[in-house]
């Protein structure tokens, strides 16, 4: 139990130490307003990262999620602005489309035995291209429901305002934790990530599980696209460029092994929080370039990947170490 939770404990420790350092430099970090702003600003990333956690836990990768955000935004902007469709109808419509696209990619991955990297890369280019066909310019979204959702928030002690977007992200994390650790689907994801051949021998349908994994990933990416469109009040074909890498970084920093089979959704939440903490510190400082966020995340990735490799080698050595047998008769 301890060895499997060690990456999570290290991630939480890094976040706590980082937060304490920020607090010593800028006492304003003690305000709940800062925490709420981190949740709101990173709500779409957190939602995507939950879906990416399941993908990486299964030993796969999903590079299409950034393009899903872009397509979701321009699609909503078009159908709401040009066709007068209510967001209450447009949201479920685009969610169904996103889930169907993920299911299709999952089917191709399992049926054709092509690496997920290739299939989702194709999906990334396809959706980005379709987004450009819809519109090359940013399309503003003007609708009362969007205005209501973007301003909806609840006051909490300390001067903070927990937005509906931040609350939705936390709800997705809670549901993700439940799915991963309290359902048959979660057990199947861990089993496939640990050893797909053994999972097959156990009677687990890898095709059905793979389809559901990628359907969940693109479904949550579509939900993140909805959140992002509410956050920006617009749809843009260039939205979400590089977000897939931020999501992967959050998952890895959160302690999920890239080889699959080990990791937690809770760790991913802290991975997202660490990225948000670094960005907020840079904003507070005012003298540092925003690119320092990428540099810091890159350093953390190097550290956590090296840590993952070290832990993996340690576990393999322990499992392969010979068992000392004691001859009772000789005693």
Swiss-Prot record:
Q: How does it sit in the membrane?
A: Multi-pass membrane protein
Keywords, alphabetical: Cell inner membrane, Cell membrane, Membrane, Sugar transport, Transmembrane, Transmembrane helix, Transport
One of the GO BP terms on file: hexose import across plasma membrane
Periplasmic compartment spans: 27-42, 110-113, 181-222, 272-294
Q: Work out whether the entry's keyword set contains Ubl conjugation.
A: no
Cytoplasmic compartment spans = 1-5, 64-88, 135-159, 244-250, 316-331
What molecular function does GO assign, one term? transmembrane transporter activity
Its transmembrane ranges are 6-26, 43-63, 89-109, 114-134, 160-180, 223-243, 251-271, 295-315
Report if keyword Zinc-finger is assigned: no
Question: Cross-referenced PANTHER family, in alphabetical order?
Answer: ABC TRANSPORTER PERMEASE PROTEIN YPHD-RELATED-RELATED, INNER MEMBRANE ABC TRANSPORTER PERMEASE PROTEIN YJFF
What does the annotation say about its assembly with partners? Answer: The complex is composed of two ATP-binding proteins (YtfR), two transmembrane proteins (YtfT and YjfF) and a solute-binding protein (YtfQ).
Function comment: Part of the ABC transporter complex YtfQRT-YjfF involved in galactofuranose transport. Probably responsible for the translocation of the substrate across the membrane.
Q: Which family does it belong to?
A: Belongs to the binding-protein-dependent transport system permease family. AraH/RbsC subfamily.
Q: What is this protein called?
A: Inner membrane ABC transporter permease protein YjfF
């Amino acid at each position: 139990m301890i060895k499997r939770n060690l990456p999570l404990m290290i991630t939480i420790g890094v976040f706590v130490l980082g937060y304490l350092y920020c607090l010593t430099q800028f006492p304003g970090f003690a305000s709940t307003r800062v925490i709420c702003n981190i949740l709101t600003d990173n709500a779409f990333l957190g939602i995507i990262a939950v879906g990416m956690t399941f993908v990486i836990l299964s030993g796969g990768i999903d590079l299409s999620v950034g393009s899903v955000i872009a397509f979701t935004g321009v699609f909503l902007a078009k159908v709401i602005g040009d066709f007068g469709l209510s967001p209450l109808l447009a949201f479920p419509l685009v969610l169904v489309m996103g889930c169907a696209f993920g299911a299709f990619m999952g089917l191709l991955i399992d049926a054709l035995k092509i690496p997920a990297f290739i299939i989702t890369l194709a999906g990334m280019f396809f959706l980005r291209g379709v987004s450009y066909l819809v519109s090359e310019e940013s399309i503003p979204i003007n609708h009362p429901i969007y205005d209501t959702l973007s301003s909806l928030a609840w006051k909490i002690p300390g001067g903070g305002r927990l937005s509906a977007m931040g609350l939705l992200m936390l709800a997705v994390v809670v549901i993700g934790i439940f799915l991963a650790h309290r359902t048959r689907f979660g057990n199947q994801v861990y089993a496939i990530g640990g050893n797909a051949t053994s999972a097959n021998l156990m009677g687990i349908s890898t095709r059905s599980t793979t389809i559901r994994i990628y359907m969940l990933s693109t479904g949550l990416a579509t939900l993140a696209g909805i959140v992002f469109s509410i956050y920006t009040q617009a749809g843009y074909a260039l939205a979400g460029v590089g977000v897939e890498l931020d999501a992967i970084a959050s998952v890895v920093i959160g302690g999920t092994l890239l080889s699959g089979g080990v990791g937690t959704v809770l760790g991913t939440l802290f991975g997202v929080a660490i990225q948000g903490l670094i960005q907020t510190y840079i904003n507070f400082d005012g003298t540092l370039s925003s690119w320092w966020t990428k540099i810091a995340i890159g350093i953390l990735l190097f550290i956590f990947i090296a840590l993952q490799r070290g832990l993996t080698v340690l576990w393999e050595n322990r499992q392969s170490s010979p068992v000392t047998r004691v001859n009772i008769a000789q005693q």
